[in-house]
Amino acid sequence: MLLSLVLHTYSMRYLLPSVVLLGTAPTYVLAWGVWRLLSAFLPARFYQALDDRLYCVYQSMVLFFFENYTGVQILLYGDLPKNKENIIYLANHQSTVDWIVADILAIRQNALGHVRYVLKEGLKWLPLYGCYFAQHGGIYVKRSAKFNEKEMRNKLQSYVDAGTPMYLVIFPEGTRYNPEQTKVLSASQAFAAQRGLAVLKHVLTPRIKATHVAFDCMKNYLDAIYDVTVVYEGKDDGGQRRESPTMTEFLCKECPKIHIHIDRIDKKDVPEEQEHMRRWLHERFEIKDKMLIEFYESPDPERRKRFPGKSVNSKLSIKKTLPSMLILSGLTAGMLMTDAGRKLYVNTWIYGTLLGCLWVTIKA
């Protein structure tokens, strides 16, 4: 009986956020769809400006749950500018929460609506979200030999030509690092060794294609590159690295701290030629690896479980997130209170998903 109560209480921690985040998706897509139609005959910059604002509202609600609700402590190291910039965001990849870390930084620069992602191809089939991410400026890419460089270049160039604010998030490893997946780690290390690159322990060998294409297309438009290194501190990891939390585990408050190190790199310090950039990118991941080795394995307790340099405990004001949650939840609740609203809500899930899948099949 007691165990059942404990398990029930645990599950309730993520049930409310999950219901609200998924439950408001049709409301958000409807609002976006209406604006898409109304702005059809307006200059593209008007559509983009309000779309970015709508995206900011939804992602602020996401941060209400992932930051305010969980009470996670955000520790920032390095140099995060206060003002928004056009940037490429390069980070180590280890959890489904990683994309929310980009939000965590962007909202502190008033750039939350400008966040766009380079995403793996399979995510375009997500109901409602898959189509919308592409509409918002996300770019779906295939791995290795199937990578469509021309398609990515065309999309990025169109955003640059339109003056679209860019906070472009790329995870160069291409897949999530998991210390328990030893075969993946061994294959990554073998790949590096075959190419004469340093073998890495706490990150996977980065792939260059998406990063090179993004920089080559946007180099005259960018302000900088952000090299971001992230650690999710567990409650009891005994000094050993363990698998990073999933979204569900994170919402269950299993991650008390996120350590985020930001290195702002001026674009003039990034080599343009692909092979030189490959070496440069690998060197950046060598730096990450050394920081992570120090974080997890340093014999000095003063240097363990922290990044080098001074940390800032950055707390996000609930005033920036709660209004968005109340607005979207209120609109959704109002829709569900009438027969017509419920029908519209269900049809949005069904037909929005089908039309979205059709659209990404043709376009994305």
From Swiss-Prot:
Coiled coil segments of this chain: none
Keyword Endoplasmic reticulum assigned: yes
SUPFAM superfamilies: Glycerol-3-phosphate (1)-acyltransferase
Pathway annotation: Phospholipid metabolism; CDP-diacylglycerol biosynthesis; CDP-diacylglycerol from sn-glycerol 3-phosphate: step 2/3
GO biological process: acylglycerol metabolic process; CDP-diacylglycerol biosynthetic process; hematopoietic progenitor cell differentiation; phosphatidic acid biosynthetic process; phosphatidylinositol acyl-chain remodeling; phospholipid biosynthetic process
Enzyme class: transferase
TM helices/strands, residue ranges: 15-35, 61-81, 344-364
Keyword Nucleus: yes
Lipid bilayer topology: Multi-pass membrane protein
Record's GO cellular component terms: endomembrane system; endoplasmic reticulum; endoplasmic reticulum membrane; mitochondrial outer membrane; mitochondrion; nuclear envelope; nucleolus
Annotated localization: Endoplasmic reticulum membrane; Nucleus envelope; Mitochondrion
Tissue expression per record: Widely expressed.
EC number: 2.3.1.51
GO molecular function: 1-acylglycerol-3-phosphate O-acyltransferase activity; acyltransferase activity
InterPro entries in UniProt: Acyltransf_C, Plipid/glycerol_acylTrfase
Alphabetical keyword list: Acyltransferase, Endoplasmic reticulum, Lipid biosynthesis, Lipid metabolism, Membrane, Mitochondrion, Nucleus, Phospholipid biosynthesis, Phospholipid metabolism, Transferase, Transmembrane, Transmembrane helix
Recorded catalytic activity of this chain's protein: a 1-acyl-sn-glycero-3-phosphate + an acyl-CoA = a 1,2-diacyl-sn-glycero-3-phosphate + CoA; 1-(9Z-octadecenoyl)-sn-glycero-3-phosphate + tetradecanoyl-CoA = 1-(9Z)-octadecenoyl-2-tetradecanoyl-sn-glycero-3-phosphate + CoA; pentadecanoyl-CoA + 1-(9Z-octadecenoyl)-sn-glycero-3-phosphate = 1-(9Z)-octadecenoyl-2-pentadecanoyl-sn-glycero-3-phosphate + CoA; 1-(9Z-octadecenoyl)-sn-glycero-3-phosphate + octadecanoyl-CoA = 1-(9Z-octadecenoyl)-2-octadecanoyl-sn-glycero-3-phosphate + CoA
Pfam families: Acyltransf_C, Acyltransferase
Sequence motif HXXXXD motif, residues: 93-98
Alphabetical list of PANTHER family matching this protein: 1-ACYL-SN-GLYCEROL-3-PHOSPHATE ACYLTRANSFERASE EPSILON, 1-ACYLGLYCEROL-3-PHOSPHATE ACYLTRANSFERASE-RELATED
Free-text domain note: The HXXXXD motif is essential for acyltransferase activity and may constitute the binding site for the phosphate moiety of the glycerol-3-phosphate.
Family to which this protein belongs: Belongs to the 1-acyl-sn-glycerol-3-phosphate acyltransferase family.
General function of this protein: Converts 1-acyl-sn-glycerol-3-phosphate (lysophosphatidic acid or LPA) into 1,2-diacyl-sn-glycerol-3-phosphate (phosphatidic acid or PA) by incorporating an acyl moiety at the sn-2 position of the glycerol backbone. Acts on LPA containing saturated or unsaturated fatty acids C15:0-C20:4 at the sn-1 position using C18:1-CoA as the acyl donor. Also acts on lysophosphatidylethanolamine using oleoyl-CoA, but not arachidonoyl-CoA, and lysophosphatidylinositol using arachidonoyl-CoA, but not oleoyl-CoA. Activity toward lysophosphatidylglycerol not detectable.
UniProt protein name: 1-acyl-sn-glycerol-3-phosphate acyltransferase epsilon
Source species: Homo sapiens (Human)
Upper classification of the organism: Eukaryota, Metazoa, Chordata, Craniata, Vertebrata
Gene (UniProt): AGPAT5
